[in-house]
Amino acid sequence: MARKNVIIALLIFLVAGQTLTAQRGGGGQGAQAAAPATPDVPIVGLAGVAFRVSDLTKARAYYQGVLGLAEAFSTKDQSGRVGSVYFKINDEQYVELVPDMKPGELRRQARVMFQSSDLKKLHAIYTERGLAPTPITTGPDGNPVFRLLGPSGAKLDFIEYVPGSQQGQLRGKLLDSRRISTHLWHVGIYTEDRAASAPFYGEKLGLPRGRDVGRGEYIETPNSDSNTETKYPKLDPNNPATRAQFERESMGAVEHMALEVTDMKATRDLVQDRGKYTDLWVRAHVGNNRHWLMHLFDPDGSRAEIMETAIQPDSIPSLSVMLPGKAVGPPILPKEPRVIPWP
């Protein structure tokens, strides 16, 4: 039944049409030193996001080879098997890969991590608000952590970095110049009923606007997303032969991360060369949020939304496409409402 509800929520929007843009968000690379989101909740910002993968070798080629994120450390279970691998974005933020994805599985996001400046205080606040945080324990990375289950089964972990932890030992290290981005700007968390979940993220977690987490970072809570437009050939949601694949690709677009960049064209050209991608796979367009956007996908379909810091002028309307290829020129402007003009 739960899977059926997930699929229904995804298809309500997807079949009706395309919304090829992210929600508008604030902040940027220059905003990372900002104060916590709200004074009475000691949340500093996003600590990272974990994606499930089916093949670590292929995943490494993407996260390290294409995105340029240095492999920082790994954790192992009691049997000695790799439990997760961390890739470093900056001293405060990591992407974690969990190698347990099975063929045909729908959900890829393993957890979303929030950084706290006072984990014990945060735990007490959430307990007083009627939430059910797990006890604070020491995670495999050496940091204290507790978990809350959010709407639609979202796994939300709250951590506090401490000296001697894996992240603490790597502070100031592995800041690879090959990184396409030095800032995780936002994370998309699948939420079946956005209206019903709003009080949880706003009133219970204490996030301003139900999304802001500090340092200019934020969460999105979509129940559908059609940002699969760089996957060709496009899949027909009404075709029984490809319906399951369509659902998986749609969920991979929903459960996403957004990386901030300062120069979209330079970034697009770089990842195209690294990944040997076609022009279609690195198409960049202006979103409704007025930022240049590009959507990349890991080998298991999890989306990385690449978003330029600058807001574009009105002369470059939403859905305008950056001129493909290495040539420099004006963008391709849309001719029809809600239709990307290229290809």
Short names for language-model regions:
Residues 33-37, 70-107, 155-163, 208-251, ...:
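Conserved short beta-strand elements that form part of the metal-binding/catalytic scaffold
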Residues 1-8:
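Bacterial N-terminal signal peptides that target proteins for export
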Residues 23-42, 44-54, 85-87, 101-180, 211-214, 218, ...:
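Vicinal oxygen chelate
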